[in-house]
Amino acid sequence: MNAFFTPEGFYRTAGYSVKWLYGLAAVCAAVAFYLGFFVCPIDATQGNSYRIIFIHVASAWMSMLIYVVMAVFSAAALVTNNKMCSIFSAAMAPTGALMAFLALFSGSFWGRPTWGTHWVWDARLTSELFLLFLYLGFLALQSAIADHRRADKACAVIAIVGVVNVPIIYFSVKWWNTLHQGASITSKGSSIAPIMLYTLLLMVVAFWIYSFASTFVRARSMILERERRQTWVQALVKEGK
């Protein structure tokens, strides 16, 4: 486990798993798509338009989870000064931004037949949009500061301060009178049909595995860039790996 949190150890270990992770994510997503669009029954209230939730909810959950994990790694980086914690946080940001955008984009397609408009300044939608801006701000700051050490510290502040927005997104439908529907899955059970629940959870697993794979790919690329003067990286370059 300690080797996993060193640049060389992670680079070598993660390289073996990326293809398998992408493959597993593709299989899970394909099965979830089939179940969601061809097997799950038509909803009595929303008709077929509800099927977008399998993408919308999965991406929204992942956008929040990724940001929380980024904040944890950012805090760990400031406390321990571990290189890999900063790399993990930065490597997750593009996927988190993609998930936040996908949640908003797919939600607009669901909102048109349900609310009569693609967008409303609802508390949950607005806080999710703010989450996307946090991701974009993190990425912009990471690119704007040439010294990656200074960039990591500045971005860590954004990640840690911005994490307060995550519970706002989650509890917005309880704290305010919003158009967005409440949670269909709670600690007391689920209000949707079992086949819909299983399909949604499978899509979440697919997005979760994809996020792992994408983070691994970016982290390995960042390691090569930051550790390019190390002998083990130069040896890899000579070997064509």
What are these model-predicted stretches?
Residues 1-241:
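Polytopic transmembrane helical bundles with strong interfacial aromatic enrichment
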